[in-house]
Design a protein with these regions (language model features):
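Signature of N6-adenine DNA methyltransferases within the class I
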Residues: 176, 180, 190-192, 198-212, ...
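C-terminal target-recognition/interaction regions appended to catalytic cores
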Residues: 261-421, 729-856
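Conserved SAM-binding motif I beta-strand of class I
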Residues: 53-56, 517-522
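Core alpha/beta nucleotide-donor-binding catalytic domains of modification enzymes
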Residues: 4-147, 158-162, 166-172, 549, ...
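Class I S-adenosyl-L-methionine
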Residues: 2-24, 94-107, 117-308, 377-383, 387-408, 412-512, 622-705, 724, ...
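Non-catalytic DNA-recognition/assembly elements of restriction-modification systems
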Residues: 422-423, 432-434, 446, 492, ...
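Short, conserved SAM-binding/catalytic segment
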Residues: 66-75, 531-543
Length: 856
């Protein structure tokens, strides 16, 4: 829970903000942590976002933010240490003020750029002080988890993700793992190391960007708000319009920040003769090589980095800006023509900082009106702080692009299912020709919306349930696939492609693989035709090659082994077409099921190295899939995602996704849950343990504690399928017990609910009357049990349990244990926190055992 101190609303609340807060789109808000001078998040201000709070340790940098009116209220500028609760409480107080004053229910964006000391996992024991420093990263993670903004952004050095931190659990782990384990249950997260020069920044800057989108924000993925690729710009294009500065100490008359920073005059000879791309160390005249004189002896400077004293190229991308951009002995700081380091203005332009950004509370016009001596005094006082903050900053254009895209996706109206149905009805899109025409001519909707319309139109035409896979769900699944660096050529199969929901995220993930071949298969020729029309709406890179195949993937002879198989196979049992069922079963090891998805699992395991499928959650526990699970558990199950009922809107089915590597032996499995909103990692053998009848993906130490106190596999279960309400009546010879009648070691009488029947002739359930049986309500997480009384029977809402070994003695203590909170929590884990697959069958009855020591 967020703690906050008492807050006080400002006496005068700005009317414009109040009006905006009452608009249909509301305010757009953000918090910035470790914000330095606010150069990066100035881009959010430019896009109309309001800064709720900004936190910076150094007051001189925080002041620069105030010069730019970043926060509406002074209390939003927080100078403090993020490791202290006092600083955090100030942030929470600001959030509370905006919540109460402006009806901001959710913070839109949390930005964090914490100091990070790059360090490999292998070397973490050698540099524990660096791990402590990286605790600031963990503080950022904790703030995201507490505040739960709609989006979060982390920006940092190239080695950020592989650097080590001490996580909230006290263990040292990579920063990427810490982010994933703490935030992966709540957010879809994109991790990317990119050079900002490819994304609109005028200079080279290789950095790590981590963007998270809260999972309850449907149809939006981190890819949707990632900066867009743009052509590189040369240094000449960026700063070539500025006047040349030839005289040391010279300050441009019209721009105080375009200045020739002074240095020791003897150093000018070191760079005056070098050409673009050359270093002072390339001078042939030894007197022009960087040196010092100690006790009359010339000592030449060491050339530790090849980019010291190096003149830059006019017609190449500008170099990376570092904190020591004030000296020639730093990296790539020498102007292409002038004998000086880049001016502040040039560095600003190279970091995409707009002219409107203020470094002082003195207006820019007044600064330019100062006398030369006054200008020099101003720069002497402020220049180093300005240059250092620029060297540490996020380029403004990068955050501005993200802000722009976040604002757009938040303001865009959502295409609801009702809207979709209306479009289909008005345009008569159940007709294939009409649908194709609509897709090809409509420019108002993007791929995701058009595919949703197409999926629902197909479903209405075929009279089937629509299993449209949302783009956020696709991102979750695709993000678990192998990384780009593993491949130079990549072959992907989507065996039941439908309208191709996975294609955009697959293309985005593997855009940097040199060659990507994607085979898409569907049994329905119309689906393939519709997909081809939809693909025209996607920008397909030249490295992506899509082949369309109309076929039944279960019977098709695939000619190659695929690197990745991904998809959402049909979920249905074949009951009428016995010939087709026989063909499917002929190829399958599991002969106990008629469900198509189980056949898909086996077939895809035979043609793919890595297999990722969305399937019904019943896979992990139903008896009919025992053989399928046995086949799968022999290979490495890298990931399991439990979507619960959140996988498909409007379809009441629980689903999971698994990623299975057919080439590898079992190892660790990462489990992500939409139910518990967390991520955890455990040995595969732990969750697929043969001592239990099925997989237990939520198994933990608490579960094991209860399991160790019990004897299992005591009962077999039976449920009646015949006795219906029509067969029963309010009174009669034999009582029919129903789920609400079952109490803790007792029968509960309920007026106008109790039922009876006079005759059991021909009913299979009759064999249990007046036998030693236990009764358990079916479909409940509040288990309770009692012995079945004489002259009673139970309908299908109650499971009838009998002992496998007649000699086993069942006591009231055993049954009473089922009604305890301890067993209820245990049973929830035993049923994998399911909501629909709760029938007590001969697998799940396993967990109703006897106590090893009879004491409640």
């Amino acid at each position: 829970m967020i703690k906050s101190k008492a807050y006080k609303l400002p006496e005068e609340i700005e009317e414009a903000i109040v009006a905006e807060s009452r608009s249909s789109y509301g305010l757009h808000t953000y918090v910035s942590l470790f914000s330095s001078a606010g150069v990066g998040c100035y881009g959010f201000k430019e896009e109309g976002f309001y800064c709720v709070a900004t936190v910076e340790l150094l007051e001189k940098r925080l002041k620069i933010q105030s010069y730019n009116n970043k926060c509406v209220y002074k209390s939003g500028y927080i100078c403090g240490d993020m490791t202290t609760q006092a600083t955090k409480d100030k942030v929470f107080a600001e959030l509370e003020m905006w919540k109460k004053g402006f009806h901001v229910t959710d913070l839109d964006v949390l930005i964090a750029t914490p100091p990070c000391q790059g360090m490999s996992v292998a070397n973490h024991k050698k540099k524990k002080d660096e791990i402590i420093r990286n605790s600031l990263v963990v503080e950022s993670i904790k703030m995201v988890h507490q505040i739960k903004p709609k989006f979060f952004i982390f920006e940092n050095v190239r080695a950020f993700l592989t650097s080590v931190c001490t996580d909230v659990d006290g263990n040292a782990k990579s920063i990427k793992e810490a982010i994933e384990m703490n935030l992966g249950g709540l957010y879809n997260i994109l991790y990317k190391v990119v050079n900002f020069k490819d994304y609109g920044n005028p200079s080279s800057r290789t950095r790590t960007l981590v963007i998270g989108v809260r999972k309850d924000i449907k149809e939006i993925t981190p890819c949707d708000v990632f900066p867009g690729k743009q052509p590189e710009r040369t240094l000449r294009q960026v700063i070539g319009h500025l006047p040349s500065l030839k005289k040391m100490g010279e300050i441009s008359e019209n721009d105080i920040y375009h200045n020739f920073r002074k240095y020791n005059p003897k150093m000018e000879a070191w760079i005056s003769e070098i050409k673009e791309g050359q270093s002072a160390f390339d001078n042939t005249d030894i007197n022009r090589i960087p040196h010092t004189v100690k006790n009359g002896v010339v000592v030449y400077n060491a050339q530790k980095n090849g980019d010291k004293y190096t003149r830059q190229y006019w017609d190449k991308v500008a170099p990376c800006i570092h904190t020591r951009n004030d000296i020639m002995a730093s990296q790539n700081t020498v102007h292409p023509v002038d004998n000086r380091v880049f001016s502040i203005r040039e560095v600003m332009l190279m970091m995409s900082v707009p002219e409107s950004f203020n470094w002082s509370d003195i207006p820019f016009e007044k600064l330019n009106a100062l006398t030369p001596k006054e200008k020099e005094a101003f720069l002497k006082k402020e220049e180093m702080n300005i240059r250092q903050t620029l060297g540490e900053a996020v380029p403004t254009i990068i955050f501005r692009q993200i802000a722009n895209k976040i604002r757009r996706v938040l303001c865009k109206p959502t295409l609801t299912e009702q809207d979709t149905k209306g479009i289909i009805e008005r345009r008569k899109l159940t007709d294939i020709d009409n649908l194709l025409r609509f897709i090809r001519t409509n420019n108002s909707y993007k791929f995701a919306e058009l595919s949703k319309i197409a999926e629902l139109a197909n479903a209405q035409r075929e009279n089937n349930a629509a299993y449209y896979t949302r783009q956020d769900t696709c991102f979750t699944i695709v993000s678990k696939l192998p990384e780009v660096k593993e491949y130079t050529t990549l072959d992907i199969l989507e065996p039941s492609v439908g309208v191709g929901n996975f294609l955009p995220t697959l293309i985005q993930k593997y855009a940097d693989v040199p060659v990507v071949n994607i085979d898409v298969v569907d049994i329905d020729e119309n689906s393939i035709t519709i997909l081809q029309a939809l693909v025209e709406k996607i920008n397909i890179p030249q490295n992506i090659h899509i082949r369309y195949i109309v076929a039944d993937s279960l019977l098709y002879n695939f000619e190659k082994k695929y690197d990745i198989v991904i998809g959402n196979p049909p979920y249905m049992k074949i009951t009428k077409d016995k010939k087709l069922l026989a063909l499917y079963k002929e190829q399958a090891q599991n002969k106990d099921t008629n469900n198509i998805f189980a056949f898909f699992i086996e077939k895809m395991m035979s043609v793919g190295n890595v297999v990722s499928l969305i399937v019904p959650k019943s896979l992990i526990n139903a008896p009919e899939f025992n053989q399928t699970r046995a086949i799968m558990k022999e290979k490495r199950i890298a990931n399991i995602i439990d979507f619960g009922e959140k996988g498909f809107k409007g379809v009441k089915i629980e689903t999971i996704n698994f990623v299975l590597d057919t080439r590898k032996a079992p190892d660790m499995t990462t489990i992500e849950s939409y139910i518990t909103e967390d991520v955890r990692c455990c040995p595969q053998e732990y969750i697929t343990d043969d001592k239990f009848p099925y997989w237990l993906i939520y198994r933990d130490s608490s579960f094991d504690k209860v399991a160790n106190e019990m004897n299992f596999n005591v009962f077999k279960a039976y449920r009646d399928r015949v006795i219906t309400k029509a067969r029963t009546k309010a009174s009669g010879r034999i009582r029919v017990l129903k789920s609400r009648n079952i109490g803790n070691n007792k029968i509960v009488n309920i007026a106008d609910y109790d039922s009876y029947i006079d005759d059991l002739d021909g009913l299979d359930v009759a064999k249990y009357m007046n036998q030693d049986c236990i009764l358990l309500p079916n479909l409940t997480y509040n288990p309770r049990a009692c012995f079945m009384p004489s002259n009673c029977i139970a309908d299908g809402s109650v499971a009838i349990l009998t002992t496998i070994d007649p000699s086993v003695n069942i006591t009231e203590d055993d049954l009473a244990f089922y009604a305890t909170d301890e067993f209820s929590k245990f049973y929830s884990v035993a049923r994998n926190r399911g909501t629909r697959s709760l029938n007590i069958d001969n697998n799940s009855v396993f967990f109703f055992g006897t106590l090893k020591q009879h004491s409640i």
